[in-house]
């Protein structure tokens, strides 16, 4: 690791799948005397862990991105986040090094620890003209990643939805996929809801997920066999439902 073997190492879960695999990530971190942080939807965040280590006096910090699935952001996103943190860090700043590629399984962590590049602060920022406008999507599919849905395999559901949309040539301007916390009807996990159609699906395994994509999100016909009943309590001032 380029010299100082005592530099704190942080294993960074890059996607929601690594948040689900928290226990495994902690085991791997223990083997490398490392800590764990998450790029998204998990605590601590990368920025929070960098701040904690820097405040404790670390002069050098090593970040290794870990992806146990197929849908994690590229390693460049970890550099982007670390670069933003470095620019915003007041006072003394540690040297931050990031592995140039992700570890795709526990065995690869040791290998990528030898592939480090310093963060300079000149990395791309967190804003871009490409991210200015709300996408022009006709549907938003919300995939529940709450505790029960996660335990029932919603990571595979999400992966199936995304890969099928890609296979059918759909982009964020067609269907926007959003990972959510608990959507409530947990007995029917994994749950997926589709807006603005207000259609809810339960027991969405990968096969059902692919049907939802092809028949509903692309074909615009809800999959009735997987649909959950949906009632809405009338409130004062509500417009009548058409």
Name each model feature, range by range.
Residues 172-188, 208-240:
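Short Fe-S-cluster ligation motifs
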Residues 139-154, 177-198:
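Local cysteine-cluster metal-coordination motifs and their immediate loop/turn environment
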Residues 1-131, 183:
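Active-site-proximal alpha-helix that buttresses catalytic centers in soluble enzyme cores
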Residues 134-142, 162-183:
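Immediate flanking context of iron-sulfur cluster ligation sites
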């Amino acid at each position: 690791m380029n010299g100082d073997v005592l530099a704190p190492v942080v294993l960074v879960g890059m996607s929601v799948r690594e948040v689900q695999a928290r226990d495994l990530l902690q085991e791997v971190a223990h083997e490398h005397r490392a800590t764990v942080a998450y790029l998204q939807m998990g605590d601590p965040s990368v920025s929070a862990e960098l701040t904690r280590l820097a405040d404790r006096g670390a002069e050098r910090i090593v970040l290794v991105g870990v992806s146990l699935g197929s849908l994690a952001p590229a390693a460049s996103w970890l550099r982007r986040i670390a670069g933003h943190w470095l620019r915003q860090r007041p006072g003394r700043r540690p040297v931050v090094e990031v592995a140039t590629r992700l570890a795709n399984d526990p065995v690869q962590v040791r290998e990528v620890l030898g592939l480090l590049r310093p963060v300079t602060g000149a990395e791309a920022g967190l804003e871009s003209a490409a991210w200015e406008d709300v996408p022009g999507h006709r549907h938003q599919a919300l995939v529940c990643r709450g505790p029960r849905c996660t335990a029932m395999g919603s990571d595979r559901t999400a992966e199936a939805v995304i890969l099928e949309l890609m296979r059918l040539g759909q982009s964020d301007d067609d269907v926007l996929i959003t990972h959510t916390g608990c959507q409530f009807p947990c007995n029917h996990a994994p749950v997926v809801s589709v807006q603005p159609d207000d259609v809810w699906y339960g027991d969405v395994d990968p096969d059902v997920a692919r049907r939802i994509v092809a028949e509903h999100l692309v074909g615009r016909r809800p999959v009735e066999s997987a649909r959950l009943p949906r009632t809405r309590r009338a409130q004062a001032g509500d417009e009548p439902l058409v």
